């Protein structure tokens, strides 16, 4: 059983779809009461002690200002009390948010409903169940919340035999229960937004209808108030604490969870432990120690004169005020009377009514109905509709004790019951003909029907045992007025029958109860039974029921007969011509364009005033890890390091003598991961594992193979009618079937939509002449026909009426051009032009400050080797040096003795997963594991392969006609079909529409007369034939006398067809009949024998194309086509605007169509809709009376081009039109001839600072670097093959200096090495033991060079040595040949700006510049000579509006016009972003050299020129002075060959096995130490590379800021939203500032208002005037903005940020109380809308700025507390951020406002 099944079974037997509570009381302050509370006990007359109610002592035995204890009422199970809901709520409105307040002491351990509220259909809408687990029952009209979601307060037990004050607050979607002013529990209430509780029903106290559990206990107070906050003040204002000075009142602490869960289950709740998991927000409310109530001397109001409230002092009313402490007296609410306070005794003079004693004589269980006197006055009885869902009952739910009716009514008992009416006869079965069974859609729910007649009385059951005497019943509802009869009309309303009597066998309790409530049998009272009264008036139509669950598809019903075609409606009057609408508001801005190329940098603005320092912003999210910092300075020498790692293996020593056997060693460290072993044998299947967690949802599997065709499924129900499918491809022609038997005539199909006119068919063969048709109805006038052949001149006819206005003719040929118009007025000044071309280079600036230290230069040439220095003192022990490279493998040592067996080592760490092994053999089947939990629903798989074609299904039932489809385009002309056999003549159709007139045929030759036939009897009128063509004019008949109009005779019977008569003489021309619509196709007739060929008939005229026939019945469904190929991926759609937040969940199925509502009031004029498609021509209406001349109609749409008219005569020359609008800009004309040389221009102004350019090409070689420090003198040796790094040997003794070798060739530039400056040299590590040879590793990174080794034996002659030291200067050599170009050097540093060079030659003609800004309007020029006469101008502007003409007749609808001519040129758009840089144009031809310009100012010094050629040898100079001692002499002769040196890392080839082997024996290679200089160089290069990387892709840090958040997003798309540093002007990063980057919104850069500008609290602002700016308020100021760090933003940076921005937005939230912010509903205008001041001092409002929108406008209604959120989203960047706001709607007594300013966000 579901945990909520109690609600399903214990709800009423009707399907309870509960209406919801509606009427909102918004933001009511605690002190402000809503409507007066409803006192339930007073309304139910408790003070008169009805049956089952008695007075008792209440909650307090002692109360201040009262001698007597509180009065309460004891309720026993005999009490049966109810009342109409309207009696409690006379206004008929139940509040949407409310409080239910009661002070009760239920009987211990009970659980029953204290209150049940039903609507007029008997559906329970509201209920409060109290006891061991209180429940709040509420269901709205949509069935929400569902029974399983009813709020259950399972942790509270108020049925513990003690008094409790309980308050329930229902506000919006929560319900809060406060017990004894301390325990507060809030639960969700999932109801609708607008819910209404029906007050037309009944309220039952203490139980539910048909429920056996009754509330038993004491109740002192029971209130319902429309203020949801009243529940929180219950103990203050409604039920104050007792007087604690005397004996304390009963304990009222509720028992919490004092019963076991089993108790609940026994009580039939069956709430599982996990059913209510929502967190209950339990709040302990403060306990007030003492509360006093102020006194008053006011007299008790007259309403309560029938009873007083004890002798306590009347209460004094005070103005409410806030209670600031628990000891202050709590005020009584204003206007709050004693009526709602507790503690008073109702001392009432009871109007005692007749007590009716119920005896047991002659009263059985069926006859003990309580009868209510019908003379109680008019009162509507609200019918409870019967539902038949309840099938089982428990004995407890049967009839209990008898019920009294409402108070004061006289009651009696009688043994009478009304007779039941007889059952009607069974209706005739429906006749459903084949083809008529068409399923219609379900109709809307009909209104409630009238009450049926009473049914027959069933046979009496066995009498039950007499029950105990029941108490007097409660008063029933007043009955409706019946027609007056001799006895009074009675209303039977039983509630329970005799007490414990057993049930009679006749009818069930539910049936009897429902009969008693619904039948309203009228039984005579007093005296013998009188005649049955007349049936009462039918009750009012019930409100629409809530939508039921969707039923199953019904069987298709029969198709109804086709209705008669209604007459055409009268032509409506033409509507008045509407006033021209006001100009529409400015359109919304278009979508942001794609980001343009960066514009030229503007001039830097003046520095702004320093802003206030902002307060510290909120803690930002943790930043990204920063970049590695710069290397710090060397620290002090550290303490002695730990022993270093073992050094490389030493040389092999002599073999030692074996030592004594050692102790067993300690277990060794785990060895390295061994190689993967071979595949082991197949293991035994393991035991079944534990249930695993459900795995994550797998990816969709691959496409499975096509499955076999499944078995044929069972016959399904006919489905709903599908929408018309798309036209399938034409099927293959089938075999010709046998001629079937003639079927029965089917019903006419529904009218199909009128199709497009088909193409003209091929002329058919002559048909057999049809029977003469009866005279058709008079047809309507046809359209004007084409011009026929000249007929015989007729008699002069009477003057006809003026014909309707013809259709507009085709547009005539264009007239000749008119004369040139007068010059137009001068136009307005144009908008600001685009950005100009960059200016000339500026003058050189002042000398800048000294630059930072540059990167170290390249090392100079090797210096001469210095003399050997004195050995230094041993330095302190350095830090441990880096591990040297691995030594080469030493020779294999002798095999040692096997050591003792070590202890077993510990388990090694888990090795890395091995490579996938080969597929093992198939293992045995394992044990089945336990069933896993169901996995999540898989995603939709890929579409499967098309399955095999299934068998042809059964012929489905004919579906209902689908909705009319859209008229398709005209299909291609089909092939001419064979001439069909003639069908049976159809019945006469209704008169058809007037056809188009056919062309007049030429007169044919007269045919031969046929043979004379025998005159037959006059046959009946034949079936009407198709309308004949217009006959030839008949001979003039003799005029007859005018006869009187005779009555219409009855239609005669149909006679048998007569024989064919002879051809008569031609009759007069008949009026053309209206062609009837095409009838349904008749059944195929049997093929007749071919007749004799008749004589050649006259050539008929071309027939008029008939109207399109009705569509035939749908053919059988074709077999489904093969799946088509997948279409190509469509073009991506335009980017949509940001959508609103979607609602949860997919949309539900469409509900049933509701009943038609009452017609609404006429709506306002809507905006003109888009032009619809051309409709079909409707049927022509009857000729109406001629109307008055109308106003001229609006200009019709341009028609389709008609056939070309005959050429008209030349018209008169028209007057000259006014000048036309300027035409669109023409195409670029050809370049004109070169103009004369212009005068020299003035010196241009200083140009704006240009963009930082892309890195330039490599510059010229820089100046030579400073001489490097002297290098070590190199050994001269032959260059050996490059070997791998050798093992580091012990430091050798330094060899003797080698001779200098000749200068070597320059080497190539090396690759960058590892970054980082070299560390301090560490001390030599201790030699370690060599390891075993490992497998060849991958080539490692180039290591640093090893230390110098000892000198080896002399090698073979070396190759050319490295460069030697510089020798002394030799004699001047001869000029050498030009060397080959060296390798391109690295880019040098930027040199200083040289002096300005001489003017260069004129360069080639540059690209066409960007148009300059529009200049100011010049003075008018001198008048030119008269030009030649211009061509005829375009048509002039329209003239003034003429006087209204007379109203023309309604014209025919025009055809769809051609596309109109292009409109006038629109206003010039806003300035676009700079376009992308065009590709460079081809070099232009050289221009004519201009005249020499004025001598310009001296230019800046030029760059140093390239070195000149070496000069010739100069003449001998004078003998100089003796020089200083010279440099070392030239190199000596070659020395002995040197050792092979370790190649530098940048030059070493890849290691190969051969190289390794070739140097294995060279243990002591001497490696030159080049590492220091190289690492520094490569470190610098690497840091340069990183700097460039950071320039290209900034990180958004303080030292590496981005330009805007958009740039940062483009550089790092994966960065999260957060705070980053930006530097819009891209200068020094010292003025960067921190902003919030909203990457989610596309890379917005956001700044925030300072603390004082963030907003103001809501207040009434009594000293301020509406319509003033906030900065003019006493507490106001201009709004200012800060960065995220709280610092003011540099004005220049702000300007640059705006330059880089395409649009900006900012939100402004206005908090209000009865104050409008934007739209004012009361006035229906925006007169009181806020106004904003932009940062460009521009005022923005609703009237002048279309970029301001209200995202949410809650203040428009000016009710209660609300807010309005306004968004300014503008492309005019200077308007944002706003700096001031004007408030216009405040100053009244209840009006308040406050606001919050949001961040300003800029999007680049």
Curated annotation (Swiss-Prot):
The similarity annotation says:
Belongs to the fibrillar collagen family.
**Where in the sequence does glycosylation occur per the annotation?**
1638
Biased composition, Polar residues: where in the chain?
Answer: 315-329
Locations listed in the record:
Secreted, Extracellular space, Extracellular matrix
Q: Which residues form the signal peptide?
A: 1-34
As recorded in UniProt, coiled-coil segments are none
What PROSITE patterns does its record include?
Answer: NC1_FIB (PS51461)
Please give one Gene Ontology molecular function term for this protein: extracellular matrix structural constituent
List each copy of the Fibrillar collagen NC1 domain by range.
Answer: 1575-1803
Q: Where is this region: Nonhelical region (C-terminal)?
A: 1541-1561
Keyword line: Calcium, Collagen, Disease variant, Disulfide bond, Extracellular matrix, Glycoprotein, Hydroxylation, Metal-binding, Repeat, Secreted, Signal
Positions of region (Triple-helical region (interrupted)): 418-506
Top-level taxon of the source organism: Eukaryota
Q: How is it modified after translation?
A: Prolines at the third position of the tripeptide repeating unit (G-X-Y) are hydroxylated in some or all of the chains.
Name used for this protein in its record: Collagen alpha-1(XI) chain
Entry note about domains:
The C-terminal propeptide, also known as COLFI domain, have crucial roles in tissue growth and repair by controlling both the intracellular assembly of procollagen molecules and the extracellular assembly of collagen fibrils. It binds a calcium ion which is essential for its function.
Q: Check the record and name the InterPro entries matching this protein.
A: Collagen, Collagen_superfamily, ConA-like_dom_sf, Fib_collagen_C, Laminin_G, TSPN-like_N
Q: Main role?
A: May play an important role in fibrillogenesis by controlling lateral growth of collagen II fibrils.
Q: Where is the composition biased (Gly residues)?
A: 539-548, 581-590, 1040-1049, 1160-1169, 1481-1490
Q: Which Gene3D superfamilies match?
A: 2.60.120.1000, 2.60.120.200
GO cellular component assignments: collagen trimer; collagen type XI trimer; collagen-containing extracellular matrix; extracellular matrix; extracellular space
